[in-house]
Curated annotation (Swiss-Prot):
Domain of life: Bacteria
pH dependence: Optimum pH is 8.0.
Organism: Sphingopyxis sp. (strain 113P3)
Signal found in the keyword field: yes
Leading EC class: hydrolase
Signal peptide (residue range): 1-34
Cellular component aspect of the GO annotation: periplasmic space
Protein name per its UniProtKB record: Oxidized polyvinyl alcohol hydrolase
MF terms (GO), sorted A to Z: beta-diketone hydrolase activity
Subunit record text: Monomer.
Catalyzed reactions per annotation: nonane-4,6-dione + H2O = pentan-2-one + butanoate + H(+)
Length: 364
């Protein structure tokens, strides 16, 4: 005969206590997880202004912090990056070079990394940063694209030092200032734009989006092999809607990314780069921005905005401050995890033409 089991008072008390302990454990776990979002290397404390000797991948790195003014709650983050020939401090404070520190006046936490080749000097322009890369990398300022020979094969799957440094830098700054975890953005011009592409491709779990300005894609054939520069231009021009593999990211390119918003900027007909003798003209940002826009637009949970202008191969020159603020507010309007169908594109400042999706003005 079945007899119901009647729990004693002590057993009921134990179950109640166990339930309470489970709830406490869950709360503590959640709190610990929130705290673990922000962490510094042991003994390092971030500060406003220039931070040096930040340990990352066995190296000492530097970055500049410009805290937000009058930011309510967690501040959205903007990480601007220079290219080959301009200094970090120019990018922060000189209108021609970006004037990005001004965004702190609008509530953004601005964190500007110093290139490894600059040896922690935020005032170094070209110098040692202007040249061909080494140790498996294509170009010198950032570890942004793998070399076309066997030395670069490792970086088909390894993100590289700079991708890890950028994330570690932001996580450390978050230990001192309250940051908005769903609004972490980065961007850059030229090699800085290429570095933006690489970070978004390898680390989409961390970033909410970015703005590559005239960045490289280092387009390749489907098998990942490289063709000469002039042939690459013809290759993309012959199939401008194709998804091109690129040495900027993993090989093969990921079929999925975490939700993000990406604004790709093309500087128009004069958006070219001459590497000087003996190389000469070595990059055309028409095919590179076309290829990047094709890829990001093909990922269902990524919002891609294609912007064209006429400033050439520079940080956007027309209404610079207004464009920067428009771009950051556009990205901030789409925090990480937002549905692409809810995204609304507002009109950019005068001098820019922007649309959702891939570029359709590059090739007629």
């Amino acid at each position: 005969m079945f007899k119901p089991v009647v729990k004693s008072r002590s057993s009921r008390s134990f179950c109640y206590l166990a339930g309470c302990l489970a709830m406490v454990a869950a709360t503590l776990s959640s709190t610990a997880q929130a705290k673990s979002e922000w962490a510094c290397p042991e003994g390092f404390t971030p500060k406003a202004g220039l931070n040096t000797d930040f340990p990352s991948d066995g190296k000492k790195r530097a970055f500049v912090v410009v805290p937000p003014k009058d930011s309510a709650g967690g501040a959205p983050v903007w990480v601007p990056m220079v290219g080959t020939v301009e200094a970090t401090n120019w990018n922060l404070n000189v209108p021609r070079s970006g004037n990005n520190a001004k965004l702190a006046e609008h509530g953004y936490m601005v964190i500007s990394p110093v290139r490894q080749c600059a040896e922690q000097d935020p005032n170094l322009g070209a110098g040692a940063c202007n040249g061909v890369g080494k140790d498996g990398w294509t170009w010198n300022p950032w570890n942004d694209g793998r070399a076309p020979d066997a030395s670069g094969d490792k970086y088909k799957t390894d993100a590289g030092d700079d991708v890890r440094f950028l994330e570690a830098m932001v996580r450390c700054v978050g230990t001192k200032w309250k940051l908005d975890r769903k609004r972490l953005f980065l961007g850059g011009i030229s090699a800085g734009g290429t570095m933006t592409n690489r970070a978004l491709l390898f680390d989409s779990e961390f970033w909410a989006g970015g703005m590559p300005i005239s960045g490289e894609w280092y387009s390749t054939k489907d098998d990942g092999s490289t063709v000469p520069f002039q042939e690459t231009r013809k290759m993309v021009a012959a199939a401008p809607a194709k998804i091109w593999q690129g040495r900027v990211g993993p090989y093969p390119l990921p079929s999925k990314l975490d939700p993000m918003v990406v604004i790709t900027v093309w500087g128009g007909e004069k958006d070219l780069w001459d590497c000087g003798p003996p190389l000469g003209l070595c990059s055309d940002y028409r095919p590179t921005t076309q290829a990047s826009s094709n890829y990001f637009s093909s990922i269902s949970n990524v919002v891609h905005v294609a912007c064209s202008a006429t400033h050439g191969h520079m940080w956007p020159q027309v209404n610079t401050d207004a464009f920067n603020l428009w771009a950051l507010n556009t990205m901030a309007s789409h925090p990480k995890g937002s549905s692409p169908k809810d995204f609304k594109l507002t009109a950019p400042p005068e001098g820019y033409s922007c649309k959702i999706g891939r570029f359709t003005d590059h090739y007629k």
